[in-house]
Amino acid sequence: HKDLFKFILNTINDKNFCWQCNRIVSEEKFQSDLKYNKQFAHKIYPPLGLYNEHYEIFQLVLLDLNIEELLRMKLNFIPRTEKIIRHGFHIDTEEYSKTSILYFNTNDGYTEFEKTGEKVQSVANRIVTFDSSEKHLGTTCTNDYARLVLNINWK
């Protein structure tokens, strides 16, 4: 697992890895200044085109999750900010499923769950899994160049 994790981390940190800038959540859900409602993303599945060249690598992450159907897999690169910015509470999909978040770097950012108030700290190679109907939010970090996570929605 550590070798796979390191290989993926090197892949996404490569200067030729393609990221697209997009909004994190809808404007009405965002909890801070809208200028911070941005992240860079790389959609692994379903691919934006016919094929994503990195899909096979990331498919190996799924082996431990007992997945019957993959709905979505997306990398998020959330740039560092001077103070922690909380993004809005949201669900990833209306469809009954699970969400797993794999953290790629250790930093002071976190995932927070609305119902319980629990915060899961961003720790490299940690994965958290929960019902997709559970409202959650992510944050920026202040002590690394970015917060890097893989978001997986599955059944």
What are these regions (language model features)?
Residues 46-155:
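Catalytic core of non-heme Fe(II) oxygenases with the double-stranded beta-helix
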Residues 1-68:
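Non-heme Fe(II)/2-oxoglutarate
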